[in-house]
């Protein structure tokens, strides 16, 4: 088990808040100057991930914070996109993996494509697990936090977190005056999908036709439409963390990301699918009462 999980939550609050403020400032400046395209420029391709210019802002903040954190309190391992060696990075750099007090898995901007064009909020996602070496899995995560990364037009932004076995928590920040207010987390209480949002993830062209056909057949079965108007509404929110958020606060009733299943069936390369860091805040959803299962 993790020692003093609340202290870890406090660190995540600080780090996430720095990310939110820096990215919002960059978006606001780009919006004013009409230079949003600069944030969407490809900066690098590393570890199988496309790194956009906006990603580099977040990477620098996380690296600097982890350096200070490790120097003050002892070694840690950061697991994130764009890092070589299977995404693992030890802080301080002369420490050994096995000496790390914990593993920090981080997706700095989940939904980069939403944010870099200033279209829709993305999310900073992080989870902390005891160091069980390379055998550590998402199930081992005991602390998780997700923070909304809003567009330059937003007034409010959410932050949610959980400690395993202690429930999930939510705070809303006013981006204009910095004030914060605790808020409830309440998934939908409806017992059907009718007159609500439910979706099968199909963000990109490969496999979209097959996934859309499956979606149509599925909803015809579970929410048959006998009238003129559709009963199930679709929202392709291109961020796994954002999808979980929509379920947690009752905006959505059902979401399934079956891209790897369809890609395998169709003989397509498994590109742009959900990675472990994309789903590292699943603990928050479970603690909030969302039912999370695999494809089986």
Predicted regions: what they are:
Residues 56-61, 72-81, 124, 242-257:
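Conserved long hydrophobic alpha-helices within structured protein cores
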Residues 1-109:
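N-terminal subdomain of lithium-sensitive/metallo-dependent phosphomonoesterases centered on the IMPase/IPPase/PAP
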Residues 62, 66, 124, 128, ...:
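Buried hydrophobic packing segments
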């Amino acid at each position: 088990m993790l020692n003093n999980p609340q202290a870890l939550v406090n660190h995540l609050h600080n780090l996430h808040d720095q990310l939110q403020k820096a990215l919002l400032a960059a978006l606001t400046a780009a919006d004013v100057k009409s230079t949003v395209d600069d944030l969407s420029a490809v900066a690098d391709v590393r570890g199988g991930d496309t790194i956009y210019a906006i990603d580099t802002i977040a990477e620098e903040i996380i690296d600097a914070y982890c350096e200070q954190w490790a120097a003050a309190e002892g070694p840690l391992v950061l697991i994130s996109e764009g890092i070589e060696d299977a995404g693992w990075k030890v802080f301080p750099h002369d420490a050994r993996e096995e000496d790390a007090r914990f593993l920090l898995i981080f997706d700095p901007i989940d939904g980069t494509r939403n944010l870099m064009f200033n279209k829709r909020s993305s999310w900073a996602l992080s989870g902390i697990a005891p160091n069980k070496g390379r055998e550590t899995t998402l199930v081992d995560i005991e602390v998780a936090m997700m923070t909304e990364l809003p567009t330059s037009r937003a007034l409010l932004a959410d932050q949610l977190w959980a400690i395993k076995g202690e429930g999930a928590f939510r705070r809303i920040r006013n981006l204009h005056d910095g004030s914060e207010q605790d808020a409830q987390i309440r998934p939908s209480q409806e017992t059907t999908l009718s007159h609500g949002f439910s979706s099968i993830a199909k963000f990109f062209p490969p496999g979209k036709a097959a996934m859309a056909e499956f979606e149509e057949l599925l909803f015809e079965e579970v929410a048959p439409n006998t009238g003129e108007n559709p009963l199930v509404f679709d929202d392709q929110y291109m961020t796994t963390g954002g999808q979980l958020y929509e379920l947690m606060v009752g905006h959505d009733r059902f979401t399934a990301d079956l891209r790897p299943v369809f890609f395998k069936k169709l003989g397509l390369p498994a590109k742009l699918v959900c990675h472990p860091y994309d789903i590292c805040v699943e603990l928050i959803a479970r603690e909030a009462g969302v039912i999370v299962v695999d494809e089986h």
